[in-house]
Amino acid sequence: GAIDFRKKSTTFSSIGPSQDGRVKPDVCGPGKSVYVIDASGMTTTNSGTSFASPIVCGMTACLWQALPELNAKQIISVVRQSADRWQWPDNIYGYGVPDYAKALSIGKKMVNENRK
């Protein structure tokens, strides 16, 4: 999902639940008035889930690179657990906005538990 700078859902962000009843979206990222580089190399702002998704994906890729011992399901779980609505997910924000410093901490604990 996409949020604005106030962490409010945008009008163009899809909502859940999924057809099989799962919470959707999984998490949200910045998607309204996001600073981007345009085709001419200038900084501008643009909006859309096409901007929110790569931000979340890029941060998740960095997290997985830092925690290569975890599998895909564990990474998804860590990202969800780090989000600000983890305790009460809904079908507008999903699990909320991930906190990647918190995700790294949760992931490191998971790695240490797996080693025991």
Residue ranges and their predicted role:
Residues 20, 62, 98-100, 111:
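Intrinsically disordered, low-complexity, compositionally biased regions/tails
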Residues 16, 71, 97-99, 104:
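Generic alpha-helical secondary structure signal
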Residues 31-93, 97:
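Hydrolase catalytic cores
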Residues 11, 26, 58, 62, ...:
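Alpha-helical scaffold segments in soluble metabolic enzymes
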Residues 102-116:
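Secreted peptidase-domain scaffold signal
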Residues 15-17, 42-44, 49, 113-115:
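Short intrinsically disordered coil segments
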Residues 7, 22, 54, 100-102:
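Residues at secondary-structure transition points
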Residues 1-38, 80-83:
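Catalytic-core segments of hydrolase enzymes
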